[in-house]
Every structure is written in C-alpha cells, then in structure tokens.
Amino acid sequence: MDVEKIMHSLEQKHPGEAEYLQAVREVLISVKDVYNQHPEFERAKLIERMVEPERILTFRVPWTDDKGEVHVNLGYRVQFNSAIGPYKGGLRFHPSVNLSILKFLGFEQTFKNALTTLPMGGGKGGSDFSIRGRSDAEVMRFCQAFMTELVKVIGPDMDVPAGDIGVGGREIGYLFGMYKKLTHEWNGVLTGKGLEWGGSRIRPEATGFGALYFVNQMLQTRDIDIKGKTVAISGFGNVAWGAATKATELGAKVVTISGPDGYIYDPDGICGEKIDYMLELRASGNDICEPYADEFPGAKFIPNKKPWEVKVDIALPCATQNELNGDDADMLLANKPLCVAEVSNMGCTAEAAEKFVAAKMLFAPGKAVNAGGVATSGLEMTQNSMRLSWSEKEVDEKLHYIMHSIHEACVKYVKQPDGYIDYVKGANIAGFMKVANAMMAQGIV
C-alpha cells in the first residue's frame, strides 16, 4: 500500500477536509503492514472503496422561529459503510458541523462499530443548527423539519441514527415522533430513546462507563490498580458525567472538568452531588463551567485554559475532537501520568497521539475507548427487535463484556516484545480486518 499516493488522491478529491483526511491517514498507517499481507485486498481496490462513503445525503432544513422568521440550515447524513450491518452513528446539531467532520466521524464509526462485536455499519449525520438559545418549540420545529428529509434514508434494517453533541433525549423524542407520524410505524429506527418508549437502561452514561472499563483493563496490563488514582476529565456533558461517575465508583478521584470558558480544579474530588451538578450545568444551556466553583467553594475555576496542566494519574479528554494538542501532550508527559485515553472522538491531534506512543505511554484511541456508547445503542436495537427490556444489571454486564472483548481485540495484533501495547494500531487493525473480510465476502459493491 502506498499511503502517500492514496492520501494525495484523497486530498485532490476532498481539499480542505482536514478532520476526514487526518482520520484516514491514521488508519492507513496503522493497517499498512497487515494490508500488504493480503494481495487480494489490492486487487479488489479495498482501501479505495473503504475510505469513501457509500452515500452522502445533503439537504436544506427550513424552519420557523417563535417570531415567525424563516431560517434555513443544512442537514447531512453520511452513510459510510454497511458491510457488517445497517449504518449506525449519531446525529450532531452544532454550528461547526460540516461534511469533513461528519465524514471523519462516519469513517471512525465504521471501525468502532466493528470492534463492538455487534452487527453495525458506520454512519454519521447532523446539521449546523444550534440548540443554544432556542426555545423548546423552536427545537421541536427544527427536529420535525429535519426528519422530513432524513426519513427517506433511514430504517431499522437500513440506517439507525442516535444522539451526539446537541442531540439528547429531547431531540431524539421529537425526531422519533415525526418519523412515526410520517411512516405510521413504531420501530427501533433511532437509539437513545426514553425508557418509557423503547430506550435502553444506562444509555446516557454508557460511553463514560465503557471508557472506564477499558481504562481499567489498560492499567491491569501493567498490574496497576485504579483505586486512589487521580483523574483529569475535560467537558461536563453526558460523556464526562458517565466517566466521572464510573471512575468514582471504581475508587478513583476525578479532580477536573472543563468547558469553553476554562476548567474547574477540585482537589477534594468531583463525586456525589458534584457529579449530579454537572448535569445541571449542561441543562442550563449556558455551556460554561465557572458556576461550579460558585456552587462548591473548595473548587477553583481557571479561565481560558485546559485541564491538562494539572498533575494527575489518568487523563481523559471527553469533550470534542482534537481538543488535546501537541503542547498539551508535552505538559502531560512532563507530569508523567499513567494513562491517556480518548473518550471523545479523535480527542487528540495526530501530533499529540504520536508523542504518547513514542513515549510508550498507555494511550488508547476513541474508536476503542468510547465504543461503549454505540455498543449500548446496539443493545437497544436488540431489545427493540426482541420487544423486551433488559435490567440495568443485564445491560451493564453486557457492556462490561463488550469492552473487555474490544480490549482483547486491540491487544491481539500489536503486543511488542517489551510488553508495550500500541492500542492505536491494534484498534485500527482489529476493526479494519473485520470490515475488510466482510467487504471481500460481498464482492465489488
């Protein structure tokens, strides 16, 4: 495989799509050696097919605000790969949404879903609409307008979206209600639903829970106990909340959360009512974390900075893509943490990830670490198909097993003679091989 030749071709076809190109390059570098062991992959032009989405839907979303003014946003659904199951991936409502970000997320989702052991392909979608500052009625009208187009390309056996940034339980409810009205059908076409109407237990916290199960497995490879370890978390939404909850349950101490305005350092630990307050912060819609320091006087707010300057044992970026850069990596490495794990999708820049791997630090990519969220979505799909509802204990046990299986799959390909595990390479190879074998079995389609 000539990585540079493939990347040059993609850069010509998709200029300016930095996030997408970064994600593709990382995977190609990781899988190059194993790809070259399979000449049949080259004959079938497997990589050239795998890096391009099967289908992209772009549409306008006209809606009316409370004052009667008409707005027009862009909507997208990237159906990236269906080799191992129906397209599966979230919907993101945020002003930053564009095709590059959605293609990167859909590409990553393909391999992440493959790692879960569940039959799910990869997809992603969303809009440049922002829920911030919008009334409940405005959000409802937007979701209904969005679904009038999305309904044409989704279905329980075709494409099953879920939530993501800006799309929580409320938005999923409005989307599902409109889908039901348009199709006259009740089925598992969306995940992240409420428990009363087809949702799965522990879904909101599943990404964070799964991440800590994975991190615990990583630490155990070096005979390290997570109990008593300090943890830096970025963000303060559902993912950060789930991670903080499970970290505390496992005996670790979470000392930071962050927002666009800066970060909170709480040396006493973010636990109990403090974790619950994170949800109040998110529900306020203000997207700032400073009020935490007013609510809990022992905490300190540090404006316009990131939490990676704090000396901790475990660092967990939980906010958004590329939030931890090369300079942040240098700060972390200087403080000699035990582990860094991407809980957000591609939470580290390529430079930061390379520095962690070069330092032989325990470092794992988002496609493995945060797969618990989509795994639990897959479990919701299963429950919908079977017309039943599992208990919290049953779902959590299945999630724990899936994260253990993902860890084993990552280790399988890349454990080095000195014992170091390159989780980035391992996750990419494990996901790639599953998708590649499925694509080869199904012919040139």
Predicted regions and their residues:
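Flexible, glycine/charged-enriched surface loops at secondary-structure junctions
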Residues: L21, Q37-A44, T117, I154-G163, ...
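Rossmann-like adenosine-cofactor binding region
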Residues: G262-F363, A368
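Glycine-rich phosphate/diphosphate-binding loop of Rossmann-like nucleotide-binding domains
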Residues: T191-G194, G199-E309
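Conserved active-site and cofactor/substrate-binding residues in soluble primary-metabolism enzymes
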Residues: M1, P15, E19-Q22, E26, ...
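Glycine/serine-rich phosphate-binding loop and adjoining beta1-alpha1 elements at the start
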Residues: H94, N113-K227
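Structured beta-strand/loop patches that form or line metal/cofactor-binding pockets in enzymes
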Residues: E40-H71
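Adenosine-phosphate binding glycine-rich loop
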Residues: D2-A23, M218, L333-V445
